[in-house]
């Protein structure tokens, strides 16, 4: 078998890894063997946190809705129950946005919820 010279592919692979580790601190950004491990770990963190991000944002939206609802005399669980009874199908992301940016609209939603809870 003929000899295989891999200078071009090895350099390309090293350049790719070092490009991905650009901005890392110390030798993690400029030594291939260490950068390769750092890039792998960064990929693991990125994969994990893309999934965690969904949970984190849901918790944030619930906290914002809860705070806004409590200002108007309801807890989050009462508010969520009232939304279901009033057949208001707005997701948590939109409710949190309304609660933060449009107090009047959120107040009218809470009034509808209170009416359904009282009935």
Curated annotation (Swiss-Prot):
One of the entry's Gene Ontology molecular-function terms is: rRNA binding
- UniProt keywords, alphabetically: Ribonucleoprotein, Ribosomal protein, RNA-binding, rRNA-binding
Regions annotated as coiled coil: none
Q: Which domain of life is it from?
A: Bacteria
Q: Does the keyword Electron transport apply?
A: no
Q: Name one Pfam family in it.
A: Ribosomal_L20
Cross-referenced SUPFAM superfamilies, in alphabetical order? Ribosomal protein L20
Swiss-Prot/TrEMBL GO biological process terms: ribosomal large subunit assembly; translation
Known InterPro entries for this protein?
Ribosomal_bL20 (IPR005813), RIBOSOMAL_L20_CS (IPR049946), Ribosomal_protein_bL20_C (IPR035566)
The UniProt entry's GO CC annotations, sorted and at most eight, read:
ribonucleoprotein complex; ribosome
The record's comment on protein family reads: Belongs to the bacterial ribosomal protein bL20 family.
Q: What does this protein do?
A: Binds directly to 23S ribosomal RNA and is necessary for the in vitro assembly process of the 50S ribosomal subunit. It is not involved in the protein synthesizing functions of that subunit.
NCBIfam families the UniProt entry points to? rplT_bact (TIGR01032)
Name-wise, this protein is: Large ribosomal subunit protein bL20
Q: What phylogenetic lineage does the species belong to?
A: Bacteria, Pseudomonadati, Pseudomonadota, Betaproteobacteria, Burkholderiales
